Amino acid sequence: MAEDPHILGLALGGGAFRGTAHLGVLKALEEEGLRPGFLCGTSAGAMAAAFYAFGMAPEEIRNVARNLRWLKATNFTFSKLGLLSNNEIGKFIEKYLGEVLIEDSSIPLAIVAADISTGEKVVFKTGSLATAIMASTCIPGVFLSELRLADSHPATDR
């Protein structure tokens, strides 16, 4: 990799299956000898950023993503807060990366979600990676937000 005094930060957005486009960006950067010095992501971008920050190559992440079946990654629930639970997404993360903490990633990482009560941005830089990604992938009205933030408000990706 080329030595450069500048640090490349990369923010990866959401978009469900479109989130796999981020893998092409990561691969292209690698081909140019560039490696992000910081990663940030939300929703599908949070998943891609997390796997990369914990050492997976873009092609390996693509193979892992193929194993995620959204209908199996969610559980139906009967609640006025949402139709599905995304607990299985947390289990999916832990299956491939273990019960890791965000701060233990090899590349500094931030996972972005929103407080469903206020709409304010919530940035996770420490704590359980699986929990942060569950918050980041939670869509209001679709997923029941079982995660409660420090002030007891549920988290969401919107």
Regions found by a protein language model. Give the residues of each.
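Patatin-like phospholipase
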Residues: 1-42, 50-158
